Amino acid sequence: MDRSSTLPDDFSARIERTDRTDEATWIEARLRPFESHTAASVVPGGFECYARLLHPSTRRGMTGGPPEVRWAEVSAWSGVPMSKDVQFHQIAFPRSEQSTPPPWRGEPARGTLTLGDATALLESLTRHTSTPSRCWFGVWDGYGGWESRETGGPPRSGVEMPKVELPGRSYLLYKGPIDGATAFSEPSFQTPNLWWPSDRSWCVASEIDLDWTYVGGSTALIQDLLHNRSLEAVPVEPSDSCVFQLAAADAPTFLEATDTLWRDGTVTISTTLGEIEAILTGRGLRSTLAISWKRHGGGSGRCTTTLDGSDSDLIGAFLGMARENLLRS
């Protein structure tokens, strides 16, 4: 994904690329193994307290309400209560037919805060560091294109500029004042995937595959975030899982359906909203999942997605595609 054409004009004035990758060595020392799939494999351990910031979705249509839809509103619509370890798909798929269409459209963004949430977060973070003018920002190197406008001249080669190498991820490193976190967000809406101040009083981590952001810091900071009405935050422990989790009510149906898909390549299931037929072709690193759906009372369609072959990705695609299409008004 090349984002070079969307960088703001003041990008280089606010932050600059740096080769001081040694500033991130403390993070690797405090991360749990990437394959542990815990909060502490994304954000470093050792802080007093942690929070998970839930990325909002976008409101459907012009309703006059706020443009962002919080998870609590989705929960209220679906009738599925939120828990401490809630994931979006768990509350977005209702147990029965709803009289109104879902208030949101599309999934929450993964790997980035919205500009509004980033701005609200900055206000809290600034109060809880002694070095707001000296911060470090890591951007996943898979995005590409960030370097081309940072100096107004030819970009420095990625080979020439070392990257922060952490388990499972590599990052371009930038430095600047704390508000540099939003330098990537105008208008491309990408915040750093990993950022912290020089005094290491807190750390913010937006893993590229997650629709929430972790923050580790002092108890006072986390309490500040949990009570910030401009954010939607829940407490989290470093040992909490960050892998895809099925809702308890969905698990038997979709796990059985997934097993059938892997075995037979096709499966049909019935839900409270309609019937779904899934066909899986290909195995190994790449496979294709095609879903046909038919709503009770009318409405049908078909869509496909490409998977990397893992069970969790298959289940996630299965649930996500079923939800998006059966709930479509």
Name each region found by the language model.
Residues 121-124, 257, 317-321:
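Charge-rich, solvent-exposed alpha-helical interaction surfaces
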Residues 2-183:
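Extended, low-hydrophobicity segments enriched in charged/polar residues
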Residues 224, 295-329:
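Mixed-charge, glycine-accented linear interaction segment located at domain edges/termini
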Residues 130-145, 233-242, 257-275, 324-329:
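Short glycine-rich, low-complexity/disordered patches
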Residues 164-221, 268-303:
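Amphipathic protein-protein interaction modules
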Residues 206-248:
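Alpha-helical oligomerization segments
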